[in-house]
Amino acid sequence: MRILFAGTPSFAAHYLSVLINSPYKVVGVLTQPDRAAGRGNYLATSAVKQLAIKHNLPVFQPEYLHENNGKHIIEHISVDILVVVAYGMIIPQDMLMFPKLGGINIHGSLLPRWRGAAPIQRALWAGDIKTGITIIQMDDGLDTGPILYQVACKILPVDTSTTLYAKLAKIGSTALLATLKQIITGSQVIEPQNNKFATYARKLNKKEARIDWQLTANQLERCIRAFNPWPISFFKIRDTIIKVWGAQIDDINYHHIPGTILSVDPVGIKIATGKGAIIITQIQLAGTKQMPVKDFLNSRPTWFIPGNILE
């Protein structure tokens, strides 16, 4: 089986690695164009491109896909199937007609829940107790195709997007290889999605990561875990951005204005929220490494004063 792989971030690179080390042949890689990144605005290549180059695979980086350039790529390298993981660009329906076996998409949720760009983060953000990997036959919709394979995993109260990515990558590897085997043997079972249960996982943005103290402590703690490793929850004090990497919930309702600093000690900074309080335990200043609150307080003991109200 000759595979054209389409993907961009490290989550996708994991699946490319699985395919490279499988009995199947990866004949080419589609990934997003190199983008300017960082303070120096340097040109950054995707994790998928880096892995492809390491294994001497042809790399295609069109600014956008349409029928003609998609057809050219597939015909040029003779593709049996297109495998898509977090590519980040819409695959035109016409392009799916060119591979002999069509295209499949590996998605990080239990579809039809959390269709869209950020399914792993939105599952944490919403307080879901489980998620999973769904492999679908691609159609002209956004994550709407019929289900070929689905496997679930628990979301633990301590999970972040980082840990959940790792869990899903592990179970997804087995799911991908099993699906390809079923396609080859013609034994796959196709199940249409029930659109009645569909939800949308909109893309994350940095503005969303700013902590809103009006939310409940439970909601804020979930946001902090969901936005790790990006965009990282933050708040401002003394016109300085403080990123929050770890927090705990205090369910007691203190009846203070949300954002009020309730107490400060080496364990954490307790702050009133819309309901309950959040205890911030792990923080980071710009240009420094993340650190326990006690280390921050040792060098800046007057930054957090009980009774003061944060923005």
Swiss-Prot record:
<dbReference type="InterPro" id="IPR037022">
    <property type="entry name" value="Formyl_trans_C_sf"/>
</dbReference>
<keyword id="KW-0808">Transferase</keyword>
<feature type="binding site">
    <location>
        <begin position="109"/>
        <end position="112"/>
    </location>
    <ligand>
        <name>(6S)-5,6,7,8-tetrahydrofolate</name>
    </ligand>
</feature>
<dbReference type="InterPro" id="IPR005793">
    <property type="entry name" value="Formyl_trans_C"/>
</dbReference>
<dbReference type="InterPro" id="IPR002376">
    <property type="entry name" value="Formyl_transf_N"/>
</dbReference>
<dbReference type="InterPro" id="IPR011034">
    <property type="entry name" value="Formyl_transferase-like_C_sf"/>
</dbReference>
<dbReference type="InterPro" id="IPR036477">
    <property type="entry name" value="Formyl_transf_N_sf"/>
</dbReference>
<dbReference type="Pfam" id="PF00551">
    <property type="entry name" value="Formyl_trans_N"/>
</dbReference>
<comment type="similarity">
    <text>Belongs to the Fmt family.</text>
</comment>
<dbReference type="InterPro" id="IPR005794">
    <property type="entry name" value="Fmt"/>
</dbReference>
<dbReference type="GO" id="GO:0005829">
    <property type="term" value="C:cytosol"/>
</dbReference>
<dbReference type="Pfam" id="PF02911">
    <property type="entry name" value="Formyl_trans_C"/>
</dbReference>
<protein>
    <recommendedName>
        <fullName>Methionyl-tRNA formyltransferase</fullName>
        <ecNumber>2.1.2.9</ecNumber>
    </recommendedName>
</protein>
<dbReference type="GO" id="GO:0004479">
    <property type="term" value="F:methionyl-tRNA formyltransferase activity"/>
</dbReference>
<keyword id="KW-0648">Protein biosynthesis</keyword>
<dbReference type="InterPro" id="IPR044135">
    <property type="entry name" value="Met-tRNA-FMT_C"/>
</dbReference>
<dbReference type="InterPro" id="IPR001555">
    <property type="entry name" value="GART_AS"/>
</dbReference>
<comment type="function">
    <text>Attaches a formyl group to the free amino group of methionyl-tRNA(fMet). The formyl group appears to play a dual role in the initiator identity of N-formylmethionyl-tRNA by promoting its recognition by IF2 and preventing the misappropriation of this tRNA by the elongation apparatus.</text>
</comment>
<dbReference type="InterPro" id="IPR041711">
    <property type="entry name" value="Met-tRNA-FMT_N"/>
</dbReference>
